[in-house]
Structures are given as C-alpha cells and as structure tokens.
Regions:
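Short hydrophobic/aromatic patches on beta-strands that form ligand-binding or substrate-lining surfaces
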Residues: 1-4, 35
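Short strand-edge motifs at loop-to-beta-strand transitions and within beta-strands
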Residues: 106-110
Length: 273
C-alpha cells in the first residue's frame, strides 16, 4: 500500500507499484507511507511487523496472524519458495476467523513455589463447586525445572506442537469422513458441541477458514477446549493427545521415577542444553 500527499498521475502510480525505492526522489518526497508486505518475511514469515520504506518510518503491525508470504500481484510462478523470491510473495491473506491471541484480561496468577517439582499441572475452575463437564474446567500448564539446570536424569518432552495442530478442531462436526476416520459414529463431548457453535475460539490446522482456505497457523494464546485432562477426543475410542500423554507421567510417578517436563516450545526456543 502507498499513501501520497496528493493525487498522482497514472505513470507515477505505475512507478510506485513497481517499487518505492526505484522511484525518482521527487516522487518519493510526495509519498507519506509505502508499506512493503514482503520486506521482512524472509527470516520471519510469521512476523506481525509491517515495514514502511519511506523516511517517515510509519511501521505498522498486523493483528491475529493472517497468512503472510502469499503470492502477490507480480507473481511469475518461476519460484515456488517464498524466501527465494520474496518480492513476488508480498500479499497477505486475511480471514475473518484468524486469531493469534484472545487478549483476555488476567483473572488470577500463580507464583510457582521454589521447591515444587517439575511436572504437568492444571488450574481447576468450578461453577458453584459443581463437578461436571458443564461446570468444571482444567487449564493445564507445565512447571519446568530451573533454567539451565536438570533436576532429574529423565526429561519428558510434552509434544505441544501436536496439541496445537489439533487444537479446537471441528472435524467431528464438519468433516464428511469423520465416521470413516474414527471407524465408528463420532462421540462428541460437550466442548465439541460448544466449539461447533463458537468458532471465535479459533481453529485447528485440520480445519478450514470461513472462506474455504486451509488453516495454516494455530496459537496457544486462547482457550483450547480439547487440550484438557478429562477430554476424550472423538477420533479415538480411548484417549488422544494430552490426556493420553498424562498416562505416561502418571506411570512414571506410580513407578517413582523422577522426571523433568519441558515442551516442544522450550526445545525450539532454548535448544537441548
């Protein structure tokens, strides 16, 4: 996008369309903002920053992580990898159901005691103290060992990338092959029915946006109703994802085997050491 101080001639518009930096200095002086959607996608495809190429530096940001690195108006099909020719992948695909962060206010915090063991924990929420699928919820979280220090010989890596891929999926209600995949009539939980009515909680990477395009981005910064210890996924007759993995941690505790817990995200950000 380009924003000028005045109405421009057709030739000036065409020149700006070809690229701000290649314009004459006279034309560049008339431009208030020239936002380049491909300027910073090579190393950071999921960046939320939009770069203004003018001296005004009116840099912006995008909300809810729409798909970047999409084929632009000038795409030639000569290169299929966006970072090999980023100038041809300057489009952004916005969806009305994109979400990167629910941006809810903080209701409570928990200070982790120094002596608490590393493990998988959950905050239990209840309505009027009632215990049922409609009145109780568990918000899982991981307590890691102190940074840079292992407290056990065994480290359990929680596969949170897999959890995010299936987070809030609606295949049980939307997919025409749900029964074929499950090998039975899908049994839906209360949270499945709720998510079917409330798509504002975001989708899984197995879902489709409202415009029919596939979902490429999933986020943990929102309620993930099928990442709960008591949730039973429609795809499996028994357990799936987090509640299946909790059987491993339960077995380790039952056998009195000490272990630390970290997540895929920790491994990605901090490395093995």
């Amino acid at each position: 996008p380009r924003l000028s101080k005045k109405a421009l001639s057709k030739s000036d518009i065409e020149s700006l369309a070809r690229g701000f930096t290649d314009c004459t200095s006279e034309l560049r002086s008339e431009v208030i903002g020239a936002w380049d959607f491909h300027a910073n996608i090579t190393k950071n495809i999921a960046s939320t920053h939009i770069i203004d190429k003018t001296s005004n530096h009116l840099n912006g940001f995008i909300i809810n992580l729409p798909c970047r690195g999409m084929t632009g108006y000038n795409w030639t099909s000569d290169e299929m990898v966006f970072h090999h020719k980023p100038e041809e992948y300057g489009a952004i695909h916005f969806h009305d159901d994109d979400i990167d962060d629910a941006r809810w206010d903080v209701d409570f915090t928990y200070k982790v005691p120094d002596l608490i063991r590393s493990g998988v924990y959950a905050a239990r929420l209840r309505i009027n103290g009632e215990e049922s699928a409609e009145t109780e919820d568990f918000i899982p979280f991981v307590i890691k060992p102190p940074k840079g220090k292992a407290t056990s010989k065994l480290c359990f890596v929680l596969p949170t990338n897999s959890y995010l891929a299936y987070s809030n999926d609606n295949l049980g209600t939307n997919s025409v092959v749900a029964q074929l995949l499950a090998g039975k009539v899908p049994v839906l939980a209360a949270s499945d029915l709720y998510l079917n009515e409330h798509r504002e909680y975001g989708l899984s990477t197995y879902s489709k946006h409202s415009d029919g395009s596939g979902v490429a981005i999933s986020s943990r910064l929102r309620p993930i109703l099928n990442m709960r210890p008591k949730y039973r996924h429609w795809l499996s007759p028994s357990l799936w994802q987090l509640n299946a993995d909790l059987h491993l941690t339960d077995w380790l505790e039952e056998k009195k085997i000490d272990f630390d817990v970290v997540t895929d995200e920790d491994l990605h950000l901090e490395g093995v050491e």
